[in-house]
């Protein structure tokens, strides 16, 4: 690994730890040339799952798009970045467990909605309004009544 400070490739790993439920390895390194410390993160290369968009075009699955969408939905809410990261991880795990080649964007959206419903109801409504392209207030009222019905069914 090249040192980000002196660009030497002479470094030593001082500590390794797993992070993000074991899907990431965090390594603390010491450059043997300039003696400065830096940290690297190793994670599994995304499997070759392709996303099938509504116009039938395909693109590689990108967890960062999901994360950005959830961050927008959770903006100014009492949801920590750690909770967002864990939610994205659960979504990614669900996708990789069920799909090995292609996944429609509609399916990704539904998985995200299911996870957001348990994370934060306002974030769920915000995401749903964009994902389902709400036209007017009745769309919002419908989703709120669905949330209330589900909460009563689950005894919340």
From Swiss-Prot:
A molecular function GO annotation: zinc ion binding
Entry's Gene Ontology BP terms: negative regulation of DNA-templated transcription
Pfam family, one: ATP-cone
PANTHER family attached to this UniProt entry: TRANSCRIPTIONAL REPRESSOR NRDR
UniProt KW Repressor keyword: yes
Record's keyword annotation contains Calcium: no
Cofactor note: Binds 1 zinc ion.
Protein name: Transcriptional repressor NrdR
């Amino acid at each position: 690994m090249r040192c980000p400070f002196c660009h030497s490739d002479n470094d030593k790993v001082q500590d390794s730890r797993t992070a993000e439920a074991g899907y990431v390895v965090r390594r603390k390194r010491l450059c043997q040339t300039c003696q400065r410390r830096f940290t690297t993160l190793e994670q599994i290369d995304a499997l070759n799952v392709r996303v099938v968009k509504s116009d039938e075009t395909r693109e590689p699955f990108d967890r960062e798009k999901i994360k950005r969408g959830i961050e927008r939905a959770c903006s100014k809410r009492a949801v920590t970045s750690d909770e967002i990261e864990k939610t994205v991880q659960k979504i990614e795990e669900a996708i990789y467990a069920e799909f090995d080649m292609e996944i429609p964007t509609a399916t990704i959206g539904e998985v995200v909605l299911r996870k957001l419903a348990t994370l934060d109801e306002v974030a769920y409504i915000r995401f749903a309004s964009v994902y389902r392209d709400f036209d007017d207030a009745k769309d919002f009222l419908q989703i709120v009544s669905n949330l209330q019905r589900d909460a009563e069914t689950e005894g919340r």
